[in-house]
A protein has these predicted regions:
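N-terminal intrinsically disordered, acidic low-complexity segments at the extreme N-terminus
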Residues: 1-3
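Exported/periplasmic ABC-transporter solute-binding proteins
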Residues: 5-77, 82-92, 99-111, 118-123, ...
Length: 274
């Protein structure tokens, strides 16, 4: 006797079919959310670059250029070169390190924090004063003979502070300059801002910062002509994205990419490496 199937809903297979379609669609939707729109690639966390404060302008431009060209996000952490190095050593977090002077990369390499470095540019110490140099400061000896006030980047946290102290200790002017220093700041940009606000008469800064501070006048002094810093970028051993970190480092060091930005912002490029 034939079985009567009249009591089994004919819509059940159809409902099961549509349920399967919905499940598949939701699965692919979740996968799509984990991918970068339009690229089919999984999103990666942004690269973290520890950058000396004096390099803020070119590096912000370079990070924006890189995002536009590759879609890779770059986060920039600014501070004094020594402060950044200490932070890297403690946290072991980040992808690239870009201090104001490559002597800090040498220290980082000695601490086994650096995998590879790429030379970029050079900068020279100058004296920042108010536009027009109203106090008529012409030499560092003026600080010994007149009650001018200084704001300095801390020699223990910032590259320019360390290099200026070493140079002026050698020529016997450090004590006079230290006595005229109202405050030591964590980074060179903090010292420049003190001059901009009229809190002090002068500050030691890098010549490359002129475009950041159009309201200030930068004076080249013979006592500072040899206070120069070589700028380079290092790939950190602690990076969890070595390939991406190397790619961005090469972008920064490329003549038509990052180096072009450095040159536009007043840096002198280092000679091409063989």
């Amino acid at each position: 006797m034939p079985v009567n199937n009249s009591n089994v809903p004919r819509s059940q297979p159809v409902l099961l079919f549509f349920a399967a379609i919905v499940a598949i669609t939701m699965t692919f939707g979740v996968v799509a959310l984990l991918r970068t729109p339009g690229t089919g690639k999984r999103k990666s966390p942004p690269l973290l670059v520890h950058v000396a404060a004096s390099l803020k302008t070119p590096m912000e431009q370079i990070a924006a250029d890189y995002l536009g060209e590759t879609g890779t996000r770059v986060e920039l952490s600014f501070g004094g070169s020594q402060t950044l190095l200490a932070n890297i050593q403690i946290t072991h977090h980040g992808d690239l390190y870009l201090p104001a002077d490559d002597s800090y990369l040498t220290l980082a390499r000695e601490k086994k924090l650096i995998k590879e470095t790429f030379p970029l540019a050079e900068q020279t110490a100058v004296l920042a004063v108010a536009k027009g140099n109203p106090k008529h400061i012409r030499a560092l000896a003026d600080f010994r003979d007149s009650p001018f006030t200084l704001s300095q980047a801390n020699p223990d946290t910032a590259a320019i502070g360390k290099l200026v102290r070493a140079a002026t200790e050698a020529n016997g002017l450090w004590t006079a300059l230290s006595n005229r220093t109202v405050v030591f700041k964590p980074a060179v940009t903090d010292a420049a801002n003190d001059v901009k606000l009229g809190a002090v008469d002068a500050a030691f800064v890098w010549d490359s910062m002129a475009r950041q501070y159009p309201d200030l006048e930068f004076i080249r002094l013979s006592e500072l002509e040899n206070v120069r810093a070589k700028v380079a970028v290092g790939v950190l051993n602690c990076s969890k994205q070595h390939d991406a970190a190397f790619a961005f480092a090469r972008f920064i060091a490329a003549p038509e990419k990052g180096l072009k930005r450095f040159q536009q912002d007043g840096f002198v490029l280092q000679p091409a490496q063989p």
